[in-house]
């Protein structure tokens, strides 16, 4: 199937898109609630009321249980689950990762998924866990590659075929695998065997795995982060270009009495108040929810409401050009997520190619903001500013500046730029009057680079007394340095 994914809006690596399937169009990014055919806390037909457009279930479980298999073959997957929207099916790879083996071949499970009418079919890949020896990861990747090549020949027609990207925690293997799969033209690309990283809060490594995989894929391909179900990390993953998530967390957490929010998880037993306004939390107090006979179901519903509320906020943030602001807010919910944010910005040079040239006002959220793609883009374009004669650089207008040939504004984290561009993106940024050390470092470094690129100009640099930084001394070697309080009023 060609042209199955259409990108509508972009911000950083994130995008809003339309994924076309045999049972309808899905708007991404979105979450696929996991449906266990044996145990359904919330029925599939109810899922649309929470915002679900697509579900995911395990074809291996259906295949292994005779009663389920018979109904699925007679009525189809959608008849079995009672859901008329798109359904993706996993192949049994999860069971393979847990138990070490499955009683089905790749060809058998592919054929079964095809017969029962799955919208997105997944081959039986090898989910290589993190931290294994490189040779094992390489060997298992070779087996996965053979199975995926066979699957691509086997599955033709309207049903979508997923090509899982494996490679353990080796970025070079992830990128190599993704590049190979790109040539096979799968319709969806899941990133597999990442659940252990998320369970261990190894978000920095997760970022590297996603980035490496994305670098090997076409930028127009839809990407599914397998097993990602907690909303606190959705924004981070979306900013890297993930489009689909799947969540069993809504049910698993409810069974354990855990209450999901976009900033983390609470234990219901310890809550005095419900910090949410979903239909469940608007109707019940924390104490009433604890005592409810259907507590698990109600908690599962809240978890779904919270999950899809975050997806909607992410989409609006993409529309507004504010995705990275949301990412920076969410990543302050946990120190390990903050590690993920810092690792994200080590990939800013790659992200910059996808980030729109103009968008909403840049808002400073913390020291990490100085490493965003738009700041890097400004640094790369410093050589476009050609300055001659006298040039004054100031943080705000000063008397006598009209006597200079060029007037520049200094604003962290960017640096110095022509004053007439102050209201132009990204220089209309909302930033603190007194920047932190890292942000000031970036701005002063860029200003020094601008001075070095324009040796024929004679610079005067006026700044605040509070700008205490070693690079101020370097600025003083290339310009007349004056603190604002000492600037001679004219």
Curated annotation (Swiss-Prot):
Its BP terms in the Gene Ontology are:
tRNA wobble guanine modification
Question: What family, per the record?
Answer: Belongs to the archaeosine tRNA-ribosyltransferase family.
Recorded metabolic or biological pathway in which this protein acts: tRNA modification; archaeosine-tRNA biosynthesis
Please report the organism this UniProt entry assigns to the protein: Methanosarcina acetivorans (strain ATCC 35395 / DSM 2834 / JCM 12185 / C2A)
Which InterPro entries does the UniProt record give? Answer: ArchSynthase1/Queuine_TRR, TGT-like_sf, TgtA, tRNA_ribo_trans-like
Q: Provide a Gene Ontology MF annotation, just one.
A: pentosyltransferase activity
Taken from the UniProt entry, a GO cellular component term is:
cytoplasm
The UniProt entry, under SUPFAM superfamilies, shows: Pre-PUA domain, tRNA-guanine transglycosylase
The name this protein goes by in its record: tRNA-guanine(15) transglycosylase
Please list the residues that bind substrate: 125, 193
Task: Supply the alphabetized keyword list.
Answer: Glycosyltransferase, Metal-binding, Transferase, tRNA processing, Zinc
Q: Which reaction does it catalyse?
A: guanosine(15) in tRNA + 7-cyano-7-deazaguanine = 7-cyano-7-carbaguanosine(15) in tRNA + guanine
Q: Where is the active site?
A: 90 (nucleophile)
The free-text function statement in the UniProt record for this protein reads: Exchanges the guanine residue with 7-cyano-7-deazaguanine (preQ0) at position 15 in the dihydrouridine loop (D-loop) of archaeal tRNAs.
State which gene encodes it: tgtA
Summarize where Zn(2+) binds, as residue positions.
276, 278, 281
Q: List the disulfide bonds.
A: none
> What stretches pass through the bilayer?
none
Instruction: Give the superkingdom in one word.
Output: Archaea
| EC code(s) of this entry | 2.4.2.48
Listed cofactors: Zn(2+)
